[in-house]
Amino acid sequence: MKHSVSVTCCALLVSSISLSYAAEVPSGTVLAEKQELVRHIKDEPASLDPAKAVGLPEIQVIRDLFEGLVNQNEKGEIVPGVATQWKSNDNRIWTFTLRDNAKWADGTPVTAQDFVYSWQRLVDPKTLSPFAWFAALAGINNAQAIIDGKATPDQLGVTAVDAHTLKIQLDKPLPWFVNLTANFAFFPVQKANVESGKEWTKPGNLIGNGAYVLKDRVVNEKLVVVPNTHYWDNAKTVLQKVTFLPINQESAATKRYLAGDIDITESFPKNMYQKLLKDIPGQVYTPPQLGTYYYAFNTQKGPTADQRVRLALSMTIDRRLMTEKVLGTGEKPAWHFTPDVTAGFTPEPSPFEQMSQEELNAQAKTLLSAAGYGPQKPLKLTLLYNTSENHQKIAIAVASMWKKNLGVDVKLRNQEWKTYIDSRNTGNFDVIRASWVGDYNEPSTFLTLLTSTHSGNISRFNNPAYDKVLAQASTENTVKARNADYNAAEKILMEQAPIAPIYQYTNGRLIKPWLKGYPINNPEDVAYSRTMYIVKH
């Protein structure tokens, strides 16, 4: 990738002068006189404090109000933010050089100490940050100990060498560390602002360092942001007003879009997909997302403890039929756990992908028979999913495939979210619906989920060879070497079948033809209003 940190982890990146990620208006473009955008978000933001954010609604707004060390471009590649360059000789100690013209919205400079304060605050148990774990995931020295109350925040492995130099020490080498710093949890906050009182995130009070400032907020109605004149790249900001409308019903948001009240939606009802394609061609988008929908098998007890049973069940899921007919809204069949769009991942073709469904079904029957199941002794199991029309539709289709091709008696069981989570955490299931959307754009965010010690390992999969190859990947210095390890891990998953990947997520949204600069192909759907503009229409 052109500016991938993963590729150049041991080198110094070039200055940000040539890498500014802002609105790029082609020569000759006639801009609309009124540069005002209305964006749909799925709910009222729970908090505009980066350390308290957890859901996409607040994150979308926070990305406009604050800026971290690095940003993502339209392809999801890392580009400079507050930092102009970074280096590491061992992937363990990282040094970031901050731009000297980065300022807070009140005109004061953004310094390395601001990041030290913000990251210490993130892991401080008193902050109660729902994303404190991300600092531990990144491997910052003492992060987990501080979260657990066994060390103090000032012992975090982050120091300000001087006003514009930030040094971070990790507990082990991590080649893709810089990728993680694009996460909103690592955005800086101004200490004086935070300590000014509980209402520091309200309009008129909030002092961020992003391209926009919060001008107005009416709870459950709207949030309005306008350009931050002190932002280092403000000269390239085109949109002069962005209004976020929180609407939690897809149908209601779509209705307002069609009425001309909204320029871009976060989603649309899947059952309207074909109609929308027909009614508003060129405005319906379903780009790939960094996420996989899958079924997890209980590898520790019950019939699915047998690898042959798991593999037979996985092979019999007709992924092509599922995406084309059952879903039919642009999803792709998942032949790997790691989505195809993941940075640093070039998947080797799965043998399953190269076989017809008839061939897969025949092999699955042989496997199930070898495991002792057949017409005289049919396999019986329970398929658990959390309550949702979409999950139910998929479960019915899969159960039908298993019954028709393998004679499996499947009992479908749906549970409300809290009960479902309890069942998942206690291993009270045979097969359970699950999904994973990457926390960062690198294969490890998916594959480490199935390592033996990971809390998200729903299947309780325990495979030393799998753990070993992923541990090895974390020490590799090149994308090519890591990709080989990741494909080796995917091969183990295919053969052992602790999970059955079903489809890769897409991110459905509606976009008016006059809105340009939206990074529609960013796998994590990371978007900044400063890259967008409206053409004359």
Functional labels for PLM-detected ranges:
Residues 219, 361, 365-438, 479, ...:
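Ligand/substrate-recognition segments at binding pockets and active sites
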